[in-house]
Amino acid sequence: MSGRSGKKKMSKLSRSARAGVIFPVGRLMRYLKKGTFKYRISVGAPVYMAAVIEYLAAEILELAGNAARDNKKARIAPRHILLAVANDEELNQLLKGVTIASGGVLPRIHPELLAKKRGTKGKSETILSPPPEKRGRKATSGKKGGKKSKAAKPRTSKKSKPKDSDKEGTSNSTSEDGPGDGFTILSSKSLVLGQKLSLTQSDISHIGSMRVEGIVHPTTAEIDLKEDIGKALEKAGGKEFLETVKELRKSQGPLEVAEAAVSQSSGLAAKFVIHCHIPQWGSDKCEEQLEETIKNCLSAAEDKKLKSVAFPPFPSGRNCFPKQTAAQVTLKAISAHFDDSSASSLKNVYFLLFDSESIGIYVQEMAKLDAK
Protein backbone atom coordinates (compact mmCIF):
# COMPACT_ATOMS: atom_id res chain seq x y z
CA MET A 1 0.00 0.00 0.00
CA SER A 2 1.18 3.52 -0.71
CA GLY A 3 1.62 6.18 1.86
CA ARG A 4 -1.43 7.98 0.51
CA SER A 5 -3.75 5.26 1.89
CA GLY A 6 -4.06 7.05 5.21
CA LYS A 7 -3.72 5.84 8.78
CA LYS A 8 -3.83 2.15 9.58
CA LYS A 9 -7.09 1.10 11.17
CA MET A 10 -6.78 0.08 14.83
CA SER A 11 -9.05 -2.51 16.38
CA LYS A 12 -11.29 -0.90 18.96
CA LEU A 13 -10.84 -2.21 22.49
CA SER A 14 -13.82 -2.58 24.76
CA ARG A 15 -13.97 -0.92 28.16
CA SER A 16 -13.63 -4.30 29.82
CA ALA A 17 -10.46 -5.10 27.85
CA ARG A 18 -8.95 -1.71 28.68
CA ALA A 19 -9.79 -2.20 32.38
CA GLY A 20 -8.48 -5.77 32.41
CA VAL A 21 -11.69 -7.39 33.62
CA ILE A 22 -14.01 -10.00 32.11
CA PHE A 23 -17.39 -8.63 33.18
CA PRO A 24 -18.94 -6.10 30.73
CA VAL A 25 -18.10 -2.61 31.94
CA GLY A 26 -20.21 -0.87 29.28
CA ARG A 27 -23.32 -2.85 30.19
CA LEU A 28 -22.84 -2.11 33.90
CA MET A 29 -22.46 1.58 33.01
CA ARG A 30 -25.80 1.53 31.18
CA TYR A 31 -27.49 -0.24 34.10
CA LEU A 32 -26.11 2.30 36.57
CA LYS A 33 -27.28 5.24 34.47
CA LYS A 34 -30.67 3.65 33.92
CA GLY A 35 -31.31 2.89 37.59
CA THR A 36 -29.72 6.00 39.14
CA PHE A 37 -30.36 8.66 36.50
CA LYS A 38 -30.56 11.45 39.08
CA TYR A 39 -26.94 11.02 40.11
CA ARG A 40 -23.68 11.50 38.25
CA ILE A 41 -21.94 8.21 37.51
CA SER A 42 -18.17 8.43 37.25
CA VAL A 43 -16.22 6.54 34.60
CA GLY A 44 -14.47 4.42 37.23
CA ALA A 45 -17.67 3.28 38.99
CA PRO A 46 -18.63 0.47 36.56
CA VAL A 47 -14.98 -0.66 36.34
CA TYR A 48 -14.75 -1.01 40.11
CA MET A 49 -18.16 -2.70 40.22
CA ALA A 50 -17.14 -5.21 37.53
CA ALA A 51 -13.88 -5.98 39.36
CA VAL A 52 -15.70 -6.62 42.66
CA ILE A 53 -18.32 -8.87 41.03
CA GLU A 54 -15.58 -10.79 39.21
CA TYR A 55 -13.63 -11.30 42.45
CA LEU A 56 -16.72 -12.51 44.34
CA ALA A 57 -17.63 -14.91 41.53
CA ALA A 58 -14.11 -16.37 41.51
CA GLU A 59 -14.13 -16.71 45.31
CA ILE A 60 -17.49 -18.51 45.33
CA LEU A 61 -16.40 -20.82 42.50
CA GLU A 62 -13.22 -21.73 44.36
CA LEU A 63 -15.09 -22.52 47.58
CA ALA A 64 -17.78 -24.41 45.66
CA GLY A 65 -15.07 -26.45 43.95
CA ASN A 66 -13.62 -27.34 47.35
CA ALA A 67 -17.08 -28.39 48.54
CA ALA A 68 -17.56 -30.57 45.45
CA ARG A 69 -14.15 -32.15 45.99
CA ASP A 70 -14.88 -32.86 49.66
CA ASN A 71 -18.17 -34.51 48.64
CA LYS A 72 -16.34 -36.52 45.95
CA LYS A 73 -18.24 -34.95 43.05
CA ALA A 74 -16.74 -34.16 39.65
CA ARG A 75 -19.08 -31.25 38.86
CA ILE A 76 -20.14 -28.19 40.83
CA ALA A 77 -23.86 -28.20 41.62
CA PRO A 78 -26.02 -25.41 43.12
CA ARG A 79 -25.83 -27.34 46.39
CA HIS A 80 -22.06 -26.86 46.48
CA ILE A 81 -22.48 -23.12 45.87
CA LEU A 82 -24.89 -22.94 48.82
CA LEU A 83 -22.41 -24.78 51.06
CA ALA A 84 -19.59 -22.52 49.87
CA VAL A 85 -21.51 -19.36 50.79
CA ALA A 86 -22.65 -20.80 54.13
CA ASN A 87 -19.14 -21.86 55.17
CA ASP A 88 -17.61 -18.42 54.54
CA GLU A 89 -18.55 -15.86 57.18
CA GLU A 90 -18.20 -12.76 54.98
CA LEU A 91 -20.05 -14.27 52.01
CA ASN A 92 -22.76 -15.55 54.34
CA GLN A 93 -23.35 -12.04 55.68
CA LEU A 94 -23.28 -10.51 52.19
CA LEU A 95 -25.67 -13.03 50.63
CA LYS A 96 -27.86 -13.56 53.68
CA GLY A 97 -31.15 -12.87 51.88
CA VAL A 98 -30.20 -14.50 48.58
CA THR A 99 -31.92 -17.74 47.54
CA ILE A 100 -29.83 -20.09 45.39
CA ALA A 101 -32.05 -22.03 42.99
CA SER A 102 -31.92 -25.83 43.48
CA GLY A 103 -29.43 -25.32 46.30
CA GLY A 104 -31.57 -26.90 49.00
CA VAL A 105 -31.31 -25.82 52.63
CA LEU A 106 -28.65 -26.06 55.30
CA PRO A 107 -29.21 -29.04 57.61
CA ARG A 108 -30.02 -28.38 61.25
CA ILE A 109 -30.27 -31.91 62.59
CA HIS A 110 -31.17 -32.44 66.23
CA PRO A 111 -28.41 -34.38 68.07
CA GLU A 112 -30.84 -37.14 69.07
CA LEU A 113 -31.85 -37.79 65.47
CA LEU A 114 -28.23 -37.66 64.36
CA ALA A 115 -27.29 -40.27 66.96
CA LYS A 116 -30.03 -42.60 65.71
CA LYS A 117 -28.95 -42.16 62.11
CA ARG A 118 -25.34 -43.05 62.81
CA GLY A 119 -26.33 -45.95 65.02
CA THR A 120 -24.44 -44.84 68.12
CA LYS A 121 -26.58 -46.61 70.69
CA GLY A 122 -24.64 -45.27 73.63
CA LYS A 123 -25.36 -41.67 72.73
CA SER A 124 -29.07 -42.17 72.14
CA GLU A 125 -29.41 -43.96 75.47
CA THR A 126 -27.64 -41.22 77.38
CA ILE A 127 -29.75 -38.50 75.82
CA LEU A 128 -33.14 -40.15 75.71
CA SER A 129 -33.37 -42.71 78.50
CA PRO A 130 -32.50 -40.83 81.76
CA PRO A 131 -35.53 -38.45 81.93
CA PRO A 132 -38.21 -41.20 81.67
CA GLU A 133 -36.34 -43.36 84.19
CA LYS A 134 -36.21 -40.58 86.76
CA ARG A 135 -39.87 -39.77 86.30
CA GLY A 136 -40.77 -43.45 86.59
CA ARG A 137 -38.86 -43.75 89.84
CA LYS A 138 -40.64 -40.76 91.28
CA ALA A 139 -44.02 -42.20 90.34
CA THR A 140 -43.27 -45.58 91.94
CA SER A 141 -41.91 -43.93 95.05
CA GLY A 142 -45.17 -41.98 95.37
CA LYS A 143 -47.13 -45.22 95.47
CA LYS A 144 -45.04 -46.48 98.36
CA GLY A 145 -45.74 -43.36 100.34
CA GLY A 146 -42.26 -41.80 100.43
CA LYS A 147 -42.99 -38.80 98.19
CA LYS A 148 -41.21 -35.99 100.01
CA SER A 149 -37.95 -37.73 100.93
CA LYS A 150 -37.31 -39.31 97.53
CA ALA A 151 -38.44 -36.31 95.48
CA ALA A 152 -36.04 -34.01 97.31
CA LYS A 153 -32.91 -36.11 96.73
CA PRO A 154 -32.66 -35.76 92.93
CA ARG A 155 -33.02 -31.96 93.19
CA THR A 156 -30.09 -31.64 95.57
CA SER A 157 -27.95 -33.99 93.49
CA LYS A 158 -28.57 -31.95 90.31
CA LYS A 159 -27.48 -28.73 92.01
CA SER A 160 -24.40 -30.31 93.54
CA LYS A 161 -23.09 -31.79 90.28
CA PRO A 162 -21.25 -28.70 88.98
CA LYS A 163 -19.90 -27.79 92.44
CA ASP A 164 -18.70 -31.10 93.90
CA SER A 165 -15.90 -31.88 91.51
CA ASP A 166 -14.52 -34.79 93.55
CA LYS A 167 -17.63 -36.97 93.31
CA GLU A 168 -18.07 -39.55 90.61
CA GLY A 169 -21.48 -38.12 89.76
CA THR A 170 -19.79 -35.16 88.07
CA SER A 171 -17.85 -37.34 85.66
CA ASN A 172 -20.99 -39.26 84.78
CA SER A 173 -22.94 -36.06 84.25
CA THR A 174 -20.33 -34.59 81.93
CA SER A 175 -20.17 -37.71 79.79
CA GLU A 176 -23.86 -38.59 79.77
CA ASP A 177 -25.80 -35.34 80.06
CA GLY A 178 -23.54 -33.39 77.70
CA PRO A 179 -21.74 -30.10 78.26
CA GLY A 180 -24.79 -28.38 79.81
CA ASP A 181 -27.19 -25.57 78.98
CA GLY A 182 -26.11 -23.08 76.34
CA PHE A 183 -24.12 -25.68 74.38
CA THR A 184 -25.45 -27.32 71.21
CA ILE A 185 -23.90 -30.56 69.95
CA LEU A 186 -24.03 -30.27 66.16
CA SER A 187 -22.55 -33.65 65.23
CA SER A 188 -20.38 -36.41 66.66
CA LYS A 189 -18.16 -39.26 65.59
CA SER A 190 -17.09 -42.39 67.47
CA LEU A 191 -13.52 -43.62 67.11
CA VAL A 192 -12.40 -47.24 67.06
CA LEU A 193 -11.69 -47.41 70.80
CA GLY A 194 -15.03 -45.79 71.71
CA GLN A 195 -14.00 -42.15 72.20
CA LYS A 196 -16.55 -39.63 70.91
CA LEU A 197 -15.59 -36.45 69.10
CA SER A 198 -18.39 -33.85 69.31
CA LEU A 199 -18.73 -30.52 67.51
CA THR A 200 -20.23 -28.12 70.05
CA GLN A 201 -21.50 -24.62 69.36
CA SER A 202 -21.83 -21.93 72.01
CA ASP A 203 -20.89 -18.39 72.92
CA ILE A 204 -17.41 -17.75 74.29
CA SER A 205 -18.91 -16.19 77.42
CA HIS A 206 -20.41 -19.59 78.39
CA ILE A 207 -17.07 -21.41 78.50
CA GLY A 208 -16.90 -21.17 82.29
CA SER A 209 -20.19 -23.07 82.68
CA MET A 210 -19.24 -25.97 80.40
CA ARG A 211 -19.64 -29.25 82.31
CA VAL A 212 -16.50 -31.09 81.29
CA GLU A 213 -13.66 -32.36 83.42
CA GLY A 214 -10.95 -30.48 81.53
CA ILE A 215 -10.86 -27.31 79.40
CA VAL A 216 -7.85 -26.56 77.20
CA HIS A 217 -6.56 -22.98 77.41
CA PRO A 218 -4.22 -22.00 74.52
CA THR A 219 -1.80 -19.42 75.86
CA THR A 220 1.78 -18.14 75.76
CA ALA A 221 4.91 -19.16 77.66
CA GLU A 222 3.93 -16.88 80.58
CA ILE A 223 0.46 -18.50 80.91
CA ASP A 224 -1.23 -15.13 80.53
CA LEU A 225 -4.98 -14.57 80.24
CA LYS A 226 -4.86 -11.79 77.64
CA GLU A 227 -6.53 -13.64 74.75
CA ASP A 228 -10.27 -14.25 74.28
CA ILE A 229 -10.33 -17.71 75.90
CA GLY A 230 -8.24 -16.55 78.85
CA LYS A 231 -10.40 -13.47 79.40
CA ALA A 232 -13.58 -15.57 79.34
CA LEU A 233 -12.12 -18.05 81.85
CA GLU A 234 -10.93 -15.23 84.12
CA LYS A 235 -14.34 -13.55 83.99
CA ALA A 236 -16.11 -16.80 84.87
CA GLY A 237 -13.65 -17.94 87.53
CA GLY A 238 -13.02 -14.58 89.16
CA LYS A 239 -10.25 -13.92 91.67
CA GLU A 240 -10.03 -17.57 92.72
CA PHE A 241 -9.11 -18.69 89.22
CA LEU A 242 -6.66 -15.80 88.82
CA GLU A 243 -4.87 -16.77 92.06
CA THR A 244 -4.69 -20.39 90.87
CA VAL A 245 -3.04 -19.31 87.62
CA LYS A 246 -0.55 -17.12 89.51
CA GLU A 247 0.43 -20.07 91.69
CA LEU A 248 0.90 -22.20 88.56
CA ARG A 249 3.21 -19.56 87.06
CA LYS A 250 5.37 -19.59 90.17
CA SER A 251 5.58 -23.37 90.41
CA GLN A 252 5.76 -24.21 86.70
CA GLY A 253 7.68 -21.26 85.32
CA PRO A 254 7.59 -20.29 81.63
CA LEU A 255 6.27 -23.04 79.37
CA GLU A 256 8.21 -24.42 76.43
CA VAL A 257 6.52 -24.49 73.03
CA ALA A 258 3.99 -27.39 72.93
CA GLU A 259 4.25 -27.90 76.71
CA ALA A 260 1.06 -28.31 78.77
CA ALA A 261 0.44 -27.59 82.46
CA VAL A 262 -2.67 -28.42 84.51
CA SER A 263 -4.25 -26.24 87.19
CA GLN A 264 -7.39 -26.42 89.31
CA SER A 265 -10.38 -24.65 87.76
CA SER A 266 -11.43 -22.56 90.73
CA GLY A 267 -14.83 -20.98 90.15
CA LEU A 268 -15.54 -22.92 86.93
CA ALA A 269 -17.86 -25.84 86.24
CA ALA A 270 -14.95 -27.95 84.99
CA LYS A 271 -12.48 -29.75 87.25
CA PHE A 272 -9.20 -28.70 85.63
CA VAL A 273 -7.82 -26.23 83.09
CA ILE A 274 -5.05 -27.48 80.78
CA HIS A 275 -2.83 -24.53 79.81
CA CYS A 276 -0.73 -25.12 76.68
CA HIS A 277 1.87 -22.98 74.90
CA ILE A 278 0.83 -23.05 71.24
CA PRO A 279 3.36 -22.28 68.46
CA GLN A 280 3.32 -19.24 66.21
CA TRP A 281 2.16 -19.71 62.61
CA GLY A 282 5.07 -19.34 60.20
CA SER A 283 7.72 -20.58 62.62
CA ASP A 284 9.83 -23.66 61.90
CA LYS A 285 7.84 -26.90 62.14
CA CYS A 286 4.82 -25.02 63.53
CA GLU A 287 2.36 -27.69 62.36
CA GLU A 288 4.37 -30.48 64.00
CA GLN A 289 4.59 -28.41 67.19
CA LEU A 290 0.83 -27.83 67.18
CA GLU A 291 0.26 -31.56 66.77
CA GLU A 292 2.62 -32.20 69.69
CA THR A 293 0.75 -29.57 71.75
CA ILE A 294 -2.58 -31.35 71.27
CA LYS A 295 -1.08 -34.72 72.16
CA ASN A 296 0.49 -33.24 75.30
CA CYS A 297 -2.92 -31.84 76.33
CA LEU A 298 -4.51 -35.27 75.91
CA SER A 299 -1.69 -36.92 77.88
CA ALA A 300 -2.08 -34.36 80.67
CA ALA A 301 -5.82 -35.09 80.80
CA GLU A 302 -5.14 -38.83 80.96
CA ASP A 303 -2.63 -38.33 83.78
CA LYS A 304 -5.46 -36.77 85.81
CA LYS A 305 -7.79 -39.66 84.82
CA LEU A 306 -10.21 -37.25 83.15
CA LYS A 307 -13.11 -38.62 81.12
CA SER A 308 -13.95 -35.52 79.06
CA VAL A 309 -11.98 -32.60 77.68
CA ALA A 310 -12.94 -29.53 75.60
CA PHE A 311 -10.74 -27.95 72.91
CA PRO A 312 -11.47 -24.37 71.78
CA PRO A 313 -10.39 -23.38 68.25
CA PHE A 314 -6.60 -23.12 68.10
CA PRO A 315 -6.41 -20.09 65.80
CA SER A 316 -6.40 -18.08 69.01
CA GLY A 317 -5.17 -14.52 69.36
CA ARG A 318 -1.62 -13.87 68.23
CA ASN A 319 -0.65 -17.30 66.89
CA CYS A 320 -2.42 -16.53 63.55
CA PHE A 321 -2.92 -20.19 62.57
CA PRO A 322 -5.26 -20.61 59.56
CA LYS A 323 -8.52 -22.19 60.67
CA GLN A 324 -8.43 -24.92 58.02
CA THR A 325 -4.86 -25.95 58.87
CA ALA A 326 -5.50 -25.86 62.62
CA ALA A 327 -8.60 -28.06 62.29
CA GLN A 328 -6.75 -30.59 60.12
CA VAL A 329 -3.81 -30.79 62.54
CA THR A 330 -6.12 -31.02 65.58
CA LEU A 331 -8.17 -33.94 64.23
CA LYS A 332 -5.07 -35.69 62.93
CA ALA A 333 -3.31 -35.41 66.31
CA ILE A 334 -6.33 -36.62 68.31
CA SER A 335 -6.95 -39.57 65.99
CA ALA A 336 -3.26 -40.56 66.06
CA HIS A 337 -3.10 -40.26 69.85
CA PHE A 338 -6.00 -42.63 70.44
CA ASP A 339 -4.72 -45.04 67.78
CA ASP A 340 -1.35 -45.26 69.56
CA SER A 341 -2.76 -45.63 73.08
CA SER A 342 -4.22 -49.02 73.96
CA ALA A 343 -6.23 -47.66 76.91
CA SER A 344 -7.35 -44.14 77.75
CA SER A 345 -9.50 -42.63 80.48
CA LEU A 346 -10.90 -40.07 78.01
CA LYS A 347 -14.33 -40.92 76.64
CA ASN A 348 -15.54 -37.57 75.24
CA VAL A 349 -13.64 -34.89 73.33
CA TYR A 350 -15.57 -31.68 72.62
CA PHE A 351 -14.60 -29.08 70.01
CA LEU A 352 -16.00 -25.82 71.34
CA LEU A 353 -16.68 -23.56 68.32
CA PHE A 354 -17.96 -19.99 68.29
CA ASP A 355 -18.38 -18.94 64.62
CA SER A 356 -20.02 -20.40 61.52
CA GLU A 357 -16.78 -20.51 59.53
CA SER A 358 -15.06 -22.75 62.10
CA ILE A 359 -18.15 -24.97 62.27
CA GLY A 360 -18.18 -25.44 58.50
CA ILE A 361 -14.46 -26.27 58.46
CA TYR A 362 -14.76 -28.83 61.27
CA VAL A 363 -17.79 -30.45 59.61
CA GLN A 364 -15.77 -30.92 56.41
CA GLU A 365 -12.69 -32.23 58.22
CA MET A 366 -14.77 -34.62 60.33
CA ALA A 367 -16.31 -35.97 57.12
CA LYS A 368 -12.81 -36.62 55.76
CA LEU A 369 -11.99 -38.41 59.00
CA ASP A 370 -15.06 -40.61 58.43
CA ALA A 371 -13.89 -41.40 54.91
CA LYS A 372 -10.49 -42.49 56.16
UniProtKB/Swiss-Prot annotation:
There is a cross-link at residue 239 (Glycyl lysine isopeptide (Lys-Gly) (interchain with G-Cter in SUMO2)). One of its GO terms (cellular component) is extracellular exosome. Residues 184-370 form the Macro domain. Residues 135-161 have a biased composition (Basic residues). It is found in: Nucleus; Chromosome. GO terms for biological process: brain development; establishment of protein localization to chromatin; heterochromatin formation; negative regulation of gene expression, epigenetic; negative regulation of transcription by RNA polymerase II; negative regulation of transcription of nucleolar large rRNA by RNA polymerase I; nucleosome assembly; positive regulation of keratinocyte differentiation. CDD domains: HFD_H2A, Macro_H2A-like. Keywords: Chromatin regulator, Chromosome, DNA-binding, Isopeptide bond, Nucleosome core, Nucleus, Ubl conjugation. It comes from the Eukaryota. SMART domains: A1pp, H2A. Residues 2-117 form the Histone H2A domain. The modification N6-lactoyllysine is found at residues 7, 9. GO terms for molecular function: chromatin DNA binding; protein heterodimerization activity; RNA polymerase II transcription regulatory region sequence-specific DNA binding; structural constituent of chromatin; transcription cis-regulatory region binding. Residues 115-182 are annotated as: Disordered. Belongs to the histone H2A family. The nucleosome is a histone octamer containing two molecules each of H2A, H2B, H3 and H4 assembled in one H3-H4 heterotetramer and two H2A-H2B heterodimers. Variant histone H2A which replaces conventional H2A in a subset of nucleosomes where it represses transcription. Nucleosomes wrap and compact DNA into chromatin, limiting DNA accessibility to the cellular machineries which require DNA as a template. Histones thereby play a central role in transcription regulation, DNA repair, DNA replication and chromosomal stability. DNA accessibility is regulated via a complex set of post-translational modifications of histones, also called histone code, and nucleosome remodeling. May be involved in stable X chromosome inactivation. This is Core histone macro-H2A.2. It comes from Homo sapiens (Human).
